[in-house]
Amino acid sequence: MAVRPGLWPVLLGIVLAAWLRGSGAQQSATVANPVPGANPDLLPHFLVEPEDVYIVKNKPVLLVCKAVPATQIFFKCNGEWVRQVDHVIERSTDSSSGLPTMEVRINVSRQQVEKVFGLEEYWCQCVAWSSSGTTKSQKAYIRIAYLRKNFEQEPLAKEVSLEQGIVLPCRPPEGIPPAEVEWLRNEDLVDPSLDPNVYITREHSLVVRQARLADTANYTCVAKNIVARRRSTSAAVIVYVNGGWSTWTEWSVCSASCGRGWQKRSRSCTNPAPLNGGAFCEGQNVQKTACATLCPVDGSWSSWSKWSACGLDCTHWRSRECSDPAPRNGGEECRGADLDTRNCTSDLCLHTASCPEDVALYIGLVAVAVCLFLLLLALGLIYCRKKEGLDSDVADSSILTSGFQPVSIKPSKADNPHLLTIQPDLSTTTTTYQGSLCSRQDGPSPKFQLSNGHLLSPLGSGRHTLHHSSPTSEAEDFVSRLSTQNYFRSLPRGTSNMAYGTFNFLGGRLMIPNTGISLLIPPDAIPRGKIYEIYLTLHKPEDVRLPLAGCQTLLSPVVSCGPPGVLLTRPVILAMDHCGEPSPDSWSLRLKKQSCEGSWEDVLHLGEESPSHLYYCQLEAGACYVFTEQLGRFALVGEALSVAATKRLRLLLFAPVACTSLEYNIRVYCLHDTHDALKEVVQLEKQLGGQLIQEPRVLHFKDSYHNLRLSIHDVPSSLWKSKLLVSYQEIPFYHIWNGTQQYLHCTFTLERINASTSDLACKVWVWQVEGDGQSFNINFNITKDTRFAELLALESEGGVPALVGPSAFKIPFLIRQKIIASLDPPCSRGADWRTLAQKLHLDSHLSFFASKPSPTAMILNLWEARHFPNGNLGQLAAAVAGLGQPDAGLFTVSEAEC
């Protein structure tokens, strides 16, 4: 086709412009479409360019561009222009140059990025315009961040010898951006900059150049990026030490003191001693060699020589020598004298007579001995007379100085019907008070002085006699009347997990020995005129269906007190152990009670108590004290609020007392750290013929869903062989955390190589995965070692399971009534029950105490429950005396006031 001549200049200009444009694009990637003749300095340049970003989960990302001078800025993503409505634009003027400035922002969502398929990545770029041309920014790539759950390669457990190299491989999960890797040793970060013996390779493997004993630990590979943090399975690394011989000792002395014998020398496998399952030393530890010792020759006397001529002193002599044979090679010297003399004139020689001075000396010694005897006899008579004077009655003695023994109250007049006689404890020295019993409801309130050293003044003008009591007819009649009441319910008898007794308004105490479980019945808790037979029972977990939901766990024994439905006018106090580590941030604790229909109900949420509640609980480190006016079946249940919630487990190691076979079993029990659980295991082991072989330990078990592992190590292979087929045993987490399974244990079976082997030395490890652990070093003779037997001697808890009346309380009745009457009324100076609660560290329960008719009685009842039978009355007396009541006349009691 022919072109008109006038069009050639136009076509030539278009081609020239295209060539210039291509040349400019090659020279600069950021400049495009310059205006012919424009100043290049006025082309847009970017102050802020978009950068590579990652989308985490579903959160959109923000891209920002800022250029000067710029009249327009638009984003282009994957070659397509972003809609104008999606741009957020800010215009301004540069303060230094006066040129127009523009800033543009857009959001990129996960859905936009996911629309791009194939190998192409999602990118965005800014294009800025000015009057001189356009400029393109750098490309920003937008990627979706993620981190897979499973590691491509996890570290494995290893056992290495000392100074051997360790390589723990780890390939982290696939992720964008690629995961960073760090290592944990027993939950502590491994920092190669602080430990030159450790480094991490580019492939993320952990390398220990030379293994040390301190490198025995659980190692965990941790991968993390901006999305998540992943942990591998922990790999247990055990650095063992093979045994090495020490140097030989010096040869011993020859076994025969005379003639042919033996010498020996020894060495021990302690350089180093085998550790963590390392091999025992090879070879003999004793060497023997023959020896010969010269026999000692004892000396013997030769024959006596002839007598010498008679001397001027009328004696002559003879001699002998120790030469037949002479002593040699350590033999004994001759015994006897080597020179013998005698009178040579017989009766013609004069004999020396005793001097008169010797006779006088003997007479003087006899006289001194007689005087000493008479003096000792006189001193003895004086001592006996003084002792008789000390046996007289003691008047006006303070009850505090008499030890607060149980009080036997006898009527002073036959026509007084309100006086009772309580049978005393015949095994102790008691104090008899002759007078009437002051009740808090009768007559004016007694008061006593607290500002001086003792707790109370002498009791009126009554007479106090210290003596050993014997049963009286009045006491026998009272007990018989209590036992013949016909309106109480009959109860089962003869079980070791039960206590029962008959009580009236004087109160008392029930205890199940060796369990930490007791029931305190304060005075006036039972209405006057009523007599109840009350029981206290410990239930086995398998006999009670206690529903536990979610993360709940049983922290205490299940205890019943009854009979249910009896009328009580004051709260009784039920005491029982628990195995929780109290922490308001880790536990939600609830007191559960079984209803008459058999269902369990939450009757108290600890920490949310109110004075109107029928129940109240004082929680301490190892025990809880429940105030209740309704008897029934109770249990303390905890619900974990975090993985820091901890239960105390007691670990006990038992083995047979007698071992007649080659096999020897070590039983490791993991039970609640409560007295009742210990009692059950001890009774079981007595039936099995077991003995304790190591001191018990306490392990803190966390709510981390990790199991409890048990393993045995360092068993001498030359003496014993372990029949365990795996490196460790496990008790599942839920078996322990549920708290309702008894006798949880693992058994390690060892086999003796020789039937004569009796010494056992090994280690038993018990630990929670990624948690607390304990190690037992066993060094035990299985035939005669009984050094741990005394640890099983359970402490007695006050003798009889039931105590009735004043003998059940540390504080005597009259002193108790005085304290109540003095501290119940409010005092402007603070000398009342509130200050007493603060001194006894019970001020967190002031609202509960204040809701009761007698707050002081509640405080004293709790003190009795916490401190019986070993409470320090001196400390209580000091706390009461420190309140500073000023009037000395307020605190005197006489028989007339009663």
Curated annotation (Swiss-Prot):
Domain ZU5, chain residue ranges per copy: 497-640
Q: Which residues form the Ig-like domain?
A: 44-141
Q: What is its main location?
A: membrane
Q: Which segments does the topology annotation call Extracellular?
A: 26-361
Q: How is it modified after translation?
A: Phosphorylated on cytoplasmic tyrosine residues. Phosphorylated by PKC in vitro. Proteolytically cleaved by caspases during apoptosis. The cleavage does not take place when the receptor is associated with netrin ligand. Its cleavage by caspases is required to induce apoptosis.
Sorted keywords for this record are: Apoptosis, Cell membrane, Cell projection, Developmental protein, Disulfide bond, Glycoprotein, Immunoglobulin domain, Membrane, Phosphoprotein, Receptor, Repeat, Signal, Transmembrane, Transmembrane helix
The residues on the Cytoplasmic side of the membrane are 383-898
| Cited function | Receptor for netrin required for axon guidance. Functions in the netrin signaling pathway and promotes neurite outgrowth in response to NTN1. Mediates axon repulsion of neuronal growth cones in the developing nervous system in response to netrin. Axon repulsion in growth cones may be mediated by its association with DCC that may trigger signaling for repulsion. It also acts as a dependence receptor required for apoptosis induction when not associated with netrin ligand.
Q: What is this protein called?
A: Netrin receptor UNC5A
Species annotation: Rattus norvegicus (Rat)
